[in-house]
A protein has these predicted regions:
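N-terminal Rossmann-like or analogous alpha/beta NTP/dinucleotide-binding catalytic cores
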Residues: 1-103
Length: 103
């Protein structure tokens, strides 16, 4: 593993306001990145399209910034990567490495 590429991430779900648990996780990730010279990334877990909101995501990011918990680079939205995930699933399925789950 390339030590220089290790990153720390915070991945909230934009389905409601940040709460104490979210903020604790964000603070721990930010402190871990800062204390080790790593980068903090933010990835929005917005695949729950029914409950996710761009307005809430924006509010969450504003709250983090207001608290001084800054990240590096653009925020990654999982929904923007859906096509990549579909390609990976298709490759795994074609190679016989996927089985249906009926749970």
């Amino acid at each position: 593993m390339n030590e220089g590429r290790i990153r720390v991430r915070f991945a909230p779900s934009p389905t409601g306001e940040l709460h104490v648990g979210n903020l604790r996780t964000a603070l721990v990730a930010w402190l871990a990145a800062r204390s080790t010279g790593r980068q903090l990334l933010v990835r929005m877990e917005d695949l729950d399209r029914h409950n996710s909101s761009a307005t809430i995501a924006s509010c969450q990011l504003s709250d983090l910034a207001a608290l001084g918990l800054h990240w590096v680079g653009e925020v990654v939205f999982q929904s923007d990567r859906f096509d990549l995930y579909r390609q990976a699933i298709d490759q795994l399925t074609a190679s016989g490495r996927v089985y249906p789950c009926f749970c």
